[in-house]
Regions:
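Gly/Ala-rich beta-loop-alpha elbow adjacent to hydrolase catalytic centers
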Residues: 198-206
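Active-site nucleophile elbow and catalytic-triad environment of alpha/beta-hydrolase enzymes
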Residues: 338-357
Length: 463
């Protein structure tokens, strides 16, 4: 979970329980509403200076005015939840239509299934894949490229987390324990022959959920879990994000970044970590890069470089769309993962039950890290192997991807070319191994054969 570098609201002397950031959210909503007329004026001016019937639209001055108005409108608008925009995929050289539908619902999460509408069933085995998206500020559509990479060879499901400001207070709170309950419920919905991919923040709750299910000999445990860039043990190579959590402490986050949802949102008066504060943290981590990107957008609009401008818009339409997090979930995650390091210390509990990764015996484990990850340092995800001591060595693998940062672990060209094929190979190998060994789903130990997992011809290092 990216905590960001938000400096917090000004401290209020006295009662530390006061949510001192609450006025910021209400002022943010008021300022957004106050800017509506200015946004409308800027958009009208942009259209005027883009109109082919206006002679000024062909001049550098006219193009500059239109570009400046567009930048103002984009900088002050509220970015809504993006669409999935996945209508088809290529399977065996054939273009197959894809239909996204919700197959499971709870107040804070929907499970989306990307159904491929085959005319004839594929001959190749299509393992079932559950992608657990991070609940860390951005919408799950940020993983659009991740979904697209796996659709040709897998039956893909993804957790679609709900913006907390859209959930009425009457639905009750949502914390890390609820998150784990949701994951277990989803795995029960999908059945035992499922593979789970946890992208960043969900690595801890996914590992916890599988640990609890194994301890109960649950027949619906997944065949494998893939943990990608997750903060399993943030004591290893701590990043600036990790250091911030330890330095500030839980009370600071409770009093400085938690706010109440203002009227007229459906979640009015719910305690949340607001999306706009999270975005402040995201942007501040690479401020110069974002300023330069918007400068280039202005120049591209003036030059008429539509392709470059469109790529910028598509990226920032996704990047600037953020969601609020339930305060209970955020604070419990900060405390459990970043402050107390409860999972690697053997102190994590779920509704009073001890979370013990050593209970995992049947579920294969694949961890993936990025060489230049500045959010989850190298070694933090690999630490899962030292916790899951009872998984057979031939059912474990680790991959350190060179030359990628945090987002490159689950998106981008290197992910598509080097990481996704390795995951697909691992998933397919574990599926075949599981079926060949006729692994009982009632918890009996299996006799899985040694399977060499590779991707693009490159062998994976055994953990």
């Amino acid at each position: 979970m990216a905590i960001g570098e938000f400096g917090g609201a000004p401290a209020v002397p006295g009662d530390n329980r006061v949510l001192v950031s609450t006025p910021l959210y209400w002022l943010y909503e008021m300022s957004h509403a106050a800017l509506n007329p200015s946004r409308a004026w800027a958009d009208a001016t942009r259209l005027l200076f883009r109109n082919p019937g206006n002679p000024w639209s062909y001049t550098t001055l006219g193009k500059s005015v239109a570009a400046a108005c567009e930048l103002f409108e984009r900088s002050t608008r509220r970015y809504t939840r993006p669409e999935w925009r996945i209508s088809s995929t290529l399977v065996g050289g054939e273009r197959i239509p894809v239909r996204a539908s919700t197959v499971w619902q709870r107040p804070f999460c929907n499970l989306v299934y990307f159904e491929r509408l085959f005319e004839h069933p594929p001959k190749r085995l299509q393992p079932k894949l559950l992608i657990v998206a991070p609940m860390s500020g951005h919408y799950p559509t940020l993983l659009r490229g991740t979904v697209e990479a796996f659709l040709p060879n897998h039956d893909v499901y993804i957790t679609d987390w709900i913006d907390a400001r859209m959930v009425p207070v009457s639905e009750g709170p949502f914390d890390l324990d609820d998150y784990i309950d949701y994951l277990i419920s989803i795995l029960h919905k999908l059945g035992g022959e499922t593979h789970v991919i946890a992208v960043c923040q969900p690595s801890v709750p996914v590992l916890a959920a599988v640990s609890l299910m194994e301890a109960e000999q649950d027949p619906c445990v997944p065949i494998s879990m893939v943990l990608m860039g997750g903060p399993i043990d943030t004591r290893i190579n701590p990043t600036a994000v990790n250091a911030l959590a330890e330095q500030r402490g839980l009370d600071w986050f409770r009093t400085h970044v938690i706010s109440k949802v203002p009227f007229p949102n459906p979640g009015f008066m719910r305690d949340v970590y607001p999306g706009f504060l999270q975005l402040n943290g995201f942007v501040s981590m690479n401020l110069e890069r974002h300023i330069e990107a918007h400068k280039q957008l202005f120049l591209n609009l003036v030059r008429g470089d539509g392709d470059s401008a469109q790529k910028h818009k598509e990226f920032y339409d996704e990047y600037l769309a953020v969601m609020d997090l339930a305060a209970e979930f955020y604070l419990q995650t900060v405390d459990t993962v970043f402050v107390r390091h409860a999972l690697p210390m053997g102190q994590m509990t779920h509704r009073g039950r001890h979370v013990d990764p050593s209970a995992i015996e049947r579920v294969a484990l694949f961890t993936i890290e990025g060489e230049h990850d500045d959010i989850s340092g190298v070694g933090q995800t690999e630490a899962a192997h030292r916790l899951c001591v009872n998984i057979p060595s031939d059912r474990q693998a680790h991959w350190l991807q060179p030359d990628v940062g945090h987002y490159g672990v689950f998106n981008g060209s290197r992910f598509r070319a080097e990481i996704a094929p390795r995951i697909s190979d691992f998933v397919l190998s574990m599926t075949l191994s599981d079926r060949a060994a006729r692994r009982p789903r009632n918890g009996a130990k299996n006799g899985a054969k040694n399977v060499r997992v590779s991707g693009n011809g490159a062998a994976l290092r055994s953990a």
